[in-house]
Amino acid sequence: MLYCLGEPFESLCRRLREAPVEHVELVNDGWHTLDRERVAKLKEIGESKGFTYTMHAPFADINIAAPVPKARQFVFRRLEESLKHALDLECRLIVFHPGMRTGISDFYPGADWKINVESVKKLLKLSRDYCVDIAIENCPEPFGFLLKNVEQFSSFFDELDEDIGLVLDVGHSNINGQTCAFIEAFSSRIVHVHAHDNDGKQDLHLGVGNGTVDW
């Protein structure tokens, strides 16, 4: 429910009760950040509506490749909280973003890439502990994410050498001009799709068919 993230949590609940859908992706961030009380309310709504939930992990101020260990400790506390909430909500999976370059990345060539891989391995272990699947999303240009294109993901999957799913964000891959390339390269890894549209230049999150994606 990213489109209503700027609305109060109570508005999200109202929209959920009225939504004519079977599947909902919750965003654990901003005004919709979860706690026990909110999880209980979402669980009640989900059971009454017959929803299947997935969850988007926090992404504001979250960088799994942060070079400072204390910063990563904060990141992992937030992500582990999401895993706990996802378990309670019986979410099918959690979507998370890859790490990002920082203002000091150029001083330590390759360090953020290494930390990103190590962090994903740690997340995979946590996900197994909580019995909740996780999947990593392709992110858009021009932002400093470490994983945006097919070539980067190919290197990442080879180095990680673990079974992890890919969330294909079609809007993001459209900006990179690689939607078909992602599907051809990683068809066996794609476990979830974010379907939205744009002009091929900006991450506009338009409705399907309202941009340049060749659906």
Describe these PLM feature segments.
Residues 69-165:
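Active-site acidic/histidine proton-transfer and metal-coordination neighborhood
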